[in-house]
């Protein structure tokens, strides 16, 4: 059992308290006084223990494309640069490239990612080998996977390990024909399960869908029954008031990817409007080919900054709400209700924020500091499922240089 003492704790109510926290096995055992003696003591030294970040949308294995094809609009980037390289990917590549992404997540205080990509067997193996938590979903489209494979994955990976789970999904309306979309809708009905996909990312995507079906992607997919049990829409940039009414009615998560949307010039999601309407918000980075970082601090700051610019209002969004979205919101979006907060009985997915870094001083408002001036530099420790995987700039239990070598080797073959 590990005892965390002598520091701040961000409680389940998102309040700063000063209490001891005991972690036994993979879970938070006790907050406050405990009669049992700890096996080891972690002296927080005045730092902050808080729930980890959860990356609610990414394509981890796309590390191969980082700074390989930049400064292009989305469709050109996908069609001319990404899809041809993805066609060359082998299953082992997914393992090696994902491992690289997992290391980067840990440096950003991320304990779990929501990943849409190919070869889920390799993704699950990499995640389990490292001890990282991964929620997977299907990238089903007109060119890969099938309704049967999605159902097989859904059944297999929801009983694979404590660290792995699987959600129904498909790539996007514009890459997936109506019959396949209907097939996913039937699976959602069969399992009473939410569905996740890219939606409303670019203006062109929305306009093309209106030409095809006479309505926006949100309204079309809702008509197809995709959101009968909720789900999530990655990006959610070009959304109308009618779309947002569907989000609210169906409990659809708006999964915001500010860095990727800015870099690809896709637009700015109306997060402030969504929050005012009571729409669920989660935060992800998107993939390392389009962002190009897997950094939740950058995402939080970009959301705050772009909302203020877009609304011409310095008080447009509350940074504390954005911090909640990156932790609790993203966890709930991913179905990770058992590791969302620092509370007894919850899984021990925890991070330590170094309050002794210059960017975190002076201490006026710790939580606002995390959003406005925080960076990876302030992550002192990342714990996943009760195991410390990253601490003081070092990865525990893995050979980082070997992971870098294998990822570079896979990338060189795809060029």
List the predicted regions and their residue ranges.
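Active-site microenvironment of metallo-dependent hydrolases
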Residues: 1-19, 24-25, 34, 324-415
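Active-site gating loops and adjacent loop-to-helix segments of metal-dependent hydrolytic enzymes
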Residues: 64-96, 130-138, 203-230, 250-253, ...
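Alpha-helical scaffold segments that flank or form the walls of functional sites
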Residues: 66-131, 151-160, 407-413
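His/Asp/Glu-enriched, well-ordered alpha-helical/loop segment
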Residues: 223-230, 272-357, 373-376
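A conserved active-site cap/scaffold subdomain adjacent to cofactor or substrate pockets
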Residues: 241-242, 248-279, 284-285
